[in-house]
Structure formats: C-alpha cells, structure tokens
Regions:
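Secreted peptidase-domain scaffold signal
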Residues: 285-393
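Active-site alpha-helical elements of protease catalytic centers
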Residues: 1-18, 226-246
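Active-site neighborhood of phospho(di)ester-bond hydrolases with catalytic His/Asp-centered motifs
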Residues: 64-66, 97-102, 143
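Subtilisin-like peptidase catalytic core
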Residues: 1-75, 261
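An often Trp-containing, charged/polar helix-loop segment at the C-terminal end
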Residues: 249-275
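Beta-sandwich interaction modules
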Residues: 430-453
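C-terminal edge strands of extracellular/lumenal beta-sandwich accessory domains
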Residues: 131, 384-413, 418, 422-425, ...
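Catalytic-core environment of secreted peptidases
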Residues: 146-235
Length: 507
C-alpha cells in the first residue's frame, strides 16, 4: 500500500528510497488495458511472445496477470487455451504467473437490493461466480480479493447513505471462487482488493474511495498511480511478496517459490467466522452448487471446509513469514529438480527431525508441510495433469519400517494399496483435508499437537502417481516448525541437528 503523496514526477529512486519498495527483482505487470492489435493475434501467441521477450531480455520470472475473460467462468469442463498456455509456459521456462481471480458483478444475476442479505452466500449458489479464464490455471497462483476497510468515505456535508457490503478482512463482495481444474483449490491466496458499498438512497452498488486500494495506473496519460477496487489490485501484492522471496533465494524454482508462499499464508479469522455463521437451512442447501454439498448420515449439509478453501485457498501471505525464519518459527526447504526429481509411481522419504525440546515445549506445536509441483499438461485428455503428487507425515516408526512399506506399494493403484500404517502413526494433517488438498499442484497441511511421544524423527513420504506422463517430476517441499513456547529456540536446535544429513532420501 502507498501512504505517501507526491507532486511532480516520481522517479525509480523515489519508489525505492521513499516509498520503501524492497526489491529490484524483475517482475512484469500488464498495465495496458488492451493489447495493441490484440485482435490480430491469438491470446495464446500473445502470452508466449510476452514471456519470451521479458524472459530472454530481462530474465523476468514473475508475471502478474490482472486480466481475464468474463465470458468464461470455469465450468468443470476441459480448460481453455489461455489457461493451458500459462501452465505450459511455466513448466517450460520455470517462471510464475500470478493471476487475479476476476471480478464478479452481483447485479448481472440478482436483484441488487438483496445483496446485503445474500452476501456471501451467493458465491456458493451461483456457478457464474467461479474464477474466470485463465485463473483456473493449475500451476499459476490465483488471487482473490478481501476488503480493506469497514468504513466508507463520507464528506462532512454529505448524508450517510453508503453501507459497507463487507467488513475489513472479510472476503470482497466482488471476488470469484473455485474450484479449479479437476476440483483443485482456487484461488490459492487472497489479498486486499477493496470493495464497493451499497448506496441506500439510490439502491445500487456504488464506488467508495474509503475502501479502494492504490496501485499503478493502466492509463498512462493520467499519471503513475490510480485508485480502484478489484482482484486486479490484490494480485500484485502476492507478486511483490514473490519477488522478495526470489531476491532472497534467486536460484529457486517456481515450485519452491509457490511452496514458500503457501507456508507463509494464513486464513483471516474474519473469513473463517463468515463461513461458520452460514446457516444450514434447507433453502440454502438446495441452492448450493454440487461442490459444496455433503451427505452427513443421510442428510445433505453444507461442506464448510470446501466453502472456506474454495473461497480463500490458503489465505493471506505474510511478507516476513515468506522471507525469514525466527527463533520460534523455522522453514526447511527442499528443491527437488533435475537429478533429484522423482520418478513416476515411486516415493521419496525425508527424515524430519523432532528435537526433544520442541516436543516438550509448552503450548501448541505445529509442523506445516507445503508441496508444489509443475506437471506436464494436456488439454485433450480427461486427466489434464500428467502426474499427481501427495504426501503423508509418519511418526512412531523407524526409517527401515517406512522404507519397507513404501517400497512394497510403489507403483500400485490407490485401490490396490493397503493402509500403510495404523491411523495413530499417520499425522492428522489438518487444514483442508487430504482428499481436497491432493486435487491441486500446490498443497499445504498442518499437524498441530500439544503432547507427543513418538520419537525424535518423523518421516515425510512423498508419492508421485502416473496419470499418463512417464517423465520424472520436479517438485519442492517446505517444512515449517512453529512453537508457542518463547523459551524454546527452535531455530538453533534445528540448525545444529540438520548439518549432517541422515537416512535414505528416496525409494
């Protein structure tokens, strides 16, 4: 956010020295409202030319795409060409597209007078509120919007007629939601995109600068900055965090960059509360899209876990969490590519050290695992992704036991596999749940515990399943330790523990 006002020209030096921008990593944001001669070239070719130009000439690896086609909300069918080319380019160039989810207009399908009562339920009942092309892209990061303020701007002599639709840190009334391709979590993140208000005098949705965000203008003749509302203004925040991470770790892959951002994100409490408060009325259940229904003992109920994660994904990325470790919060990174990539229908096993001091610390302890991979894709197949990956965190077993079980089941179909271990030995990784998590190429789960007596090592088992591609698969892992006990210096404990690698790395 920009809080300084300038007169005259703003130079690059002003931006870095006075506004506090922290990175000069090359990233590209499209600020032209319409491409020059856009109708003379297919959008697929335009995307490829843009990437080739900025990658070849500037080494640009982060592309912010605050554009989309409102005519094509994702409808669970085969993805369109614009979506596919983003996935292909990211795998080919090891770059990252960060895409806005698109803006939803409630008035197209509903009576505007009902918006205050209908918000946020309409996201889950209206299929046209889904993310638009190309925001369903499997490898891109998609960003939805949340409200910046609860207080509309009102002039001193103006009658108060503007009512906020959303409160601060709640989901924006004009964002769009998932699911994405093959039920994947979309959007993955949310950021401040502002919101409009409901004007009680005019009975219409109106703009209000009190809840707008400031960004670069896409009208070059009107100055450098502008203020407006929409997910187009939320996506650049995530792009900026990605650039800071890339400046800190300049040689990391697209996969590790995405995994770090996921590990640094959390769902705002205000949005969690919004979902919790939704009533399971029969009328609401009947209107829900199929994705958000579940059968509970013969009764149809709202699946609030899916509602939350298809609304906000993994939440709001926090800058410091993405770029640094702390005494009570530490990230371990693994960028598994090239010769370290995983073969299809095989496993990799990682030893996760559990220091005694961490296990015995007061309060809650958390181990968060984030996995990202960039499979080859094919628009013409029912299985869009060439491979699927997943992970489990095992405790209370030796490395040899884990190795033997995983080796015996490598390459088997899911229905042929037996349960690896009793449930008590498999960490209950929360958040969205295993099934929902595994639909996407960016996965995150947290194991939270207060007491444990399962030994000094856990084992992270990573699986790669062939859908139709036989190529080895690059991927990345981030394992984050977090402890509430301020007396436990987990950073130093882990730093000393992992200097010498131990155990088998893969099966």
């Amino acid at each position: 956010m920009l809080y300084n006002f300038y007169l005259g020209n703003v130079t690059e030096k002003d931006l870095f020295d006075n506004i506090g921008l922290k990175t000069r990593v090359q990233e590209t944001k499209s600020i032209i409202k319409k491409y020059t001669h856009m109708h003379e070239k297919l959008i697929v070719n335009q995307m490829r030319e843009i990437v080739e130009y900025f990658y070849d000439n500037y080494g640009c690896r982060i592309f912010n795409l605050s554009q989309g086609d409102l005519n094509y909300p994702y409808n669970d069918k085969k993805p369109r060409a614009w979506t596919c080319v983003l996935d292909e380019l990211q795998r080919e160039y090891d770059i990252l597209f960060i895409v806005s989810s698109g803006n939803y207009d409630y008035t197209y399908e509903h009576d505007v007078k009902n918006i205050l009562a209908d918000y946020p339920k309409y996201f889950f009942t209206d299929e046209k509120a889904r993310v638009i092309d190309p925001a369903a892209s499997s490898i891109s990061l998609t960003v939805g919007g949340m409200a910046l303020s609860s207080i509309p701007f009102v002039a001193s002599d103006e009658r108060i007629s503007a009512l906020p639709i959303s409160q601060k840190n709640q989901i924006s009334s004009s964002t769009r939601i998932g699911p994405g391709i093959q039920k994947a979590i979309k959007p993955e993140f949310v950021a401040y995109g502002g919101d409009n208000v409901f004007n009680t005098m005019l009975s219409k949705i109106s703009p209000n600068v009190g809840n707008y965000v400031i960004s670069l203008s896409n009208k070059l003749t009107d100055g450098l900055f502008c203020q407006d509302v929409g997910t187009s203004f939320a996506a650049p925040y995530v792009s900026h965090i990605a650039a800071l991470v890339l400046e800190r770790y300049p040689h990391i892959s697209n996969n590790l960059l995405r995994a770090i951002l996921a590990s640094a994100s959390s769902v705002p409490k205000e949005i969690e509360l919004q979902i919790e408060k939704l009533d399971d009325t029969e009328e609401f259940i009947n209107c829900l899209q199929p994705s958000f229904k579940q059968n509970v003992k013969g009764q149809m109920r709202a699946n609030k876990k899916k509602m939350l994660h298809y609304l906000v994904g993994y939440g709001y990325p926090i800058q410091d969490m993405a770029t640094d470790s702390f005494e009570q919060r530490v990230m371990l990174l693994a960028d598994m590519k090239d010769e370290n990539a995983i073969q299809v229908d095989k496993n990799h096993i990682f030893e996760i050290p559990i220091p005694k001091e961490f296990e015995a610390a007061k309060g809650k302890k958390r181990i968060t695992v984030s996995l990202a991979y960039n499979p080859d894709v094919r628009k013409t197949r029912m299985d869009y992704l060439g491979k699927s990956m997943s992970f489990d965190l095992i405790r209370g077993k030796s490395l040899e036991e884990v190795y033997q079980v995983c080796a015996s089941q490598a390459g088997l179909d899911e229905e042929e596999k037996k349960e690896r271990f009793e449930s008590k030995y498999i960490c209950d990784i929360g958040n969205c749940g295993k099934t929902l998590r595994e639909y996407g190429t960016l996965q995150k789960g947290t194991f939270e515990f207060s007491r444990s007596s399962y030994g000094e090592n856990y084992y992270l088992v990573v699986d790669c399943k062939k859908n139709w591609s036989v190529e080895k698969q690059n991927y990345a892992l981030v394992v984050t330790y977090q402890v509430e006990d301020k007396s436990v210096k987990i950073y130093e404990l882990l730093k000393n523990r992992i200097r010498v690698p131990r155990g088998r790395e893969r099966v």
